[in-house]
């Protein structure tokens, strides 16, 4: 049985660990709220672009934008969004499992895959897997900036425009609520025409005047729309990261509390046994005299 000194040392060590995990839990909760706000603020921008594109497409039914061009799929690109840091439970593991399944399924069809990594954890996974990597960006911080992301994602978008890639997928973790996050692998390009169908609304319809022409405006807006979707995915992934970290740190704090309770019980038993032994020795010595 460990001595009382050793047990006291263990209790102090676990208490210090619990202070750290509790602080990390509070920091993650604060960051999660800010990430949720950024996520909500990004949605109206993409929705407004979608609305304008839908109305312009309806007014120009014969125009087929480059981002909506469908062709036989021989090579795909995937933008993988993960975290830069750990301590967020199985968040990255779940989305990387989707990527592993995608690789297996596409290899069976002899379809090539080219990846873009956003986040250190995904980059490490792709390097270990010896996957084809065409661009990357890591250490993007707690606040995503489009000027940081654009350098990595433009490689995929331009490859699709040139016909070098026939489809682009986006893998990330969707934020549902503070206790639930879902790994997602969804098709980004080509855009589905149904997704850009204008919603039926009562009231006046917009009549746009386009300069230099509607086709140029549509192509430009669609690119901004796709970029906004990627930004939204990164924002959701960050909110998911902080919520998962908050839950993980809370679980760690609760476990530390339980361990401290068990160690305190062991300490009391050990101390009681030592006192009983001393009393027995005193009584035995007195009887001998």
Swiss-Prot record:
Cross-referenced InterPro entries: ATP_synth_F1_ATPase_gsu, ATP_synth_F1_gsu, ATP_synth_F1_gsu_CS
Protein known as: ATP synthase gamma chain
Source organism per UniProt: Polynucleobacter necessarius subsp. necessarius (strain STIR1)
Topology in the lipid bilayer: Peripheral membrane protein
Role noted for this protein: Produces ATP from ADP in the presence of a proton gradient across the membrane. The gamma chain is believed to be important in regulating ATPase activity and the flow of protons through the CF(0) complex.
Higher taxonomy: Bacteria, Pseudomonadati, Pseudomonadota, Betaproteobacteria, Burkholderiales
GO molecular function: ATP binding; proton-transporting ATP synthase activity, rotational mechanism
Location of the protein in the cell: Cell inner membrane
Domain of life per record: Bacteria
Name of the coding gene: atpG
Protein family according to the UniProt entry: Belongs to the ATPase gamma chain family.
GO CC annotation terms, alphabetical: plasma membrane; proton-transporting ATP synthase complex
Subunit record text: F-type ATPases have 2 components, CF(1) - the catalytic core - and CF(0) - the membrane proton channel. CF(1) has five subunits: alpha(3), beta(3), gamma(1), delta(1), epsilon(1). CF(0) has three main subunits: a, b and c.
SUPFAM superfamilies per UniProt: ATP synthase (F1-ATPase), gamma subunit
GO biological process per UniProt: proton motive force-driven plasma membrane ATP synthesis
Pfam families listed in its UniProt record: ATP-synt
Principal cellular location given in the protein's record: membrane
CDD domains, per database record: F1-ATPase_gamma
Keywords for the protein's UniProt record, in alphabetical order: ATP synthesis, Cell inner membrane, Cell membrane, CF(1), Hydrogen ion transport, Ion transport, Membrane, Transport
């Amino acid at each position: 049985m460990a001595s009382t000194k050793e047990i006291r040392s263990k209790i102090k060590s676990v208490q210090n660990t619990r202070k750290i995990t509790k602080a990390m839990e509070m920091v993650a909760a604060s960051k999660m709220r800010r990430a949720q706000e950024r996520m909500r603020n990004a949605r109206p921008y993409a929705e407004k672009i979608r609305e304008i594109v839908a109305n312009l497409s309806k007014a120009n039914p014969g125009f087929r934008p480059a981002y909506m061009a469908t062709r036989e799929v021989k090579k795909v690109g995937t933008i993988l969004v993960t975290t830069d840091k750990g301590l967020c439970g199985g968040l990255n593991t779940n989305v990387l499992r989707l990527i592993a399944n995608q690789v297996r399924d596409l290899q069976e069809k002899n379809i090539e895959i080219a990846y873009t990594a956003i986040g250190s954890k995904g980059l490490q996974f792709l390097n270990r897997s010896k996957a084809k990597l065409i661009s990357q960006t890591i250490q993007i911080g707690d606040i995503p900036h489009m000027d940081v992301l654009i350098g990595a994602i433009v490689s995929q978008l331009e490859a699709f425009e040139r016909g070098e890639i026939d489809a682009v997928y986006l893998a990330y973790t969707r934020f549902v609520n503070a206790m639930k996050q879902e790994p997602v692998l969804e098709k980004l390009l080509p855009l589905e025409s149904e997704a850009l169908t204008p919603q039926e609304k009562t009231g006046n319809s917009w009549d746009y005047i386009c300069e230099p022409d509607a086709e140029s405006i549509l192509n430009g807006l669609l690119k901004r729309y796709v970029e906004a979707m990627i930004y939204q995915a990164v924002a959701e992934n960050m909110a998911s990261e902080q919520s998962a970290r908050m839950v993980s740190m809370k679980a760690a704090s609760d476990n530390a509390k339980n361990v401290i309770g068990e160690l305190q019980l062991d300490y009391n038993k050990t101390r009681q046994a030592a006192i009983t032994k001393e009393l027995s020795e005193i009584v035995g010595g007195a009887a001998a005299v």
